[in-house]
């Protein structure tokens, strides 16, 4: 659900600046997600887990495969956010209100997509943490 | 890092329902960070052998201290958010709504500012953890290849 402050949109420079700022924030967020994905890639394929855990490698492989899909989704969303910047800048050139409304709606849709992705990624990270956290190799107990 | 204070004028237009929704989002994010703290702490404390071998031990000690500080800050912020959520319930029942409403919005802005500041600091800490643990994992992999 989109809970944006319900102020009606009007295409003036101040509003465009607000949309651009929001767009920059999404970009920063997605850039950080990419860094997290890179780390998780390394983490899941490192030899840091306890030995002799049933199905450990199968589970890690499943996480790894899901992570590759998340990575692709993140890249795709980054491209959409990048391209959307030009749509926002183009709003000022709209000749009628329906054109402005269309691009504003696109903005809200993309906002929702970024939020949904963030939620999905957070859930995925929680699953990795709760499964792998207790399985980290305890140096003091294990050779 | 210096904490920038923003005015967030759009808060003036937010309905109580929207402010409540934001507060619940803060609460949920802070809950997630709490779990993440636990995970990172386990990782830094338990994954010691490669870290010792990679000579990153003192750096890891610093990160564990920073995690502890981050956890304390989180607790404070979490309490403020919880009180803020409860206050809205009281506010909706209060007759002197206008004055209380102004104060509530002011508090909402202050928490928003602190939440954003906290998130930025925490992101930096995560970046440092990724860098150090990433280095240790890579060095461990190289050693195995050369062994």
For every predicted segment, state its role.
Chain A
Residues 1-143:
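Charge-rich amphipathic alpha-helical interaction elements
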């Amino acid at each position: 659900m989109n809970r944006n402050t319900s102020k009606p949109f009007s295409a003036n420079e101040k509003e465009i600046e607000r949309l651009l700022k929001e767009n920059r924030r999404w970009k920063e967020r997605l850039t950080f997600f990419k860094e997290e994905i890179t780390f998780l890639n390394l983490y899941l394929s490192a030899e840091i887990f306890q030995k002799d855990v049933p199905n450990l490698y199968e589970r890690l492989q499943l996480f790894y495969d899901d992570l590759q899909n998340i990575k692709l989704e993140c890249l795709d969303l980054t491209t959409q956010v990048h391209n959307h910047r030009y749509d926002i800048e183009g709003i000022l050139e709209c000749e009628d209100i329906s054109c402005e409304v269309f691009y504003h709606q696109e903005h809200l849709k993309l906002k929702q997509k970024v939020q949904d992705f963030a939620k999905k990624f957070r859930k995925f990270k929680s699953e990795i943490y709760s499964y792998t956290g207790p399985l980290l190799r305890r140096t003091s107990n294990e050779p | 890092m210096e904490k920038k204070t923003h005015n967030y004028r759009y808060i003036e237009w937010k309905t109580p329902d929207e402010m409540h929704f934001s507060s619940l989002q803060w609460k949920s994010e802070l809950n997630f960070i709490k779990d993440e703290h636990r995970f990172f702490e386990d990782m830094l404390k338990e994954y010691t052998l490669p870290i010792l071998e990679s000579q990153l031990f003192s750096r890891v000690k610093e990160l564990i201290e920073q995690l502890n500080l981050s956890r304390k800050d989180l607790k404070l912020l979490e309490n403020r958010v919880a009180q803020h959520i409860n206050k809205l319930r009281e506010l909706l029942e209060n007759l002197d709504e206008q004055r209380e409403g102004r104060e509530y919005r002011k508090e909402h802005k202050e928490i928003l500012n602190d939440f954003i500041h906290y998130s930025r600091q925490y992101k930096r800490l995560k970046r440092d953890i990724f860098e150090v643990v990433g280095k240790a994992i890579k060095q461990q992999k190289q050693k195995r290849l050369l062994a």
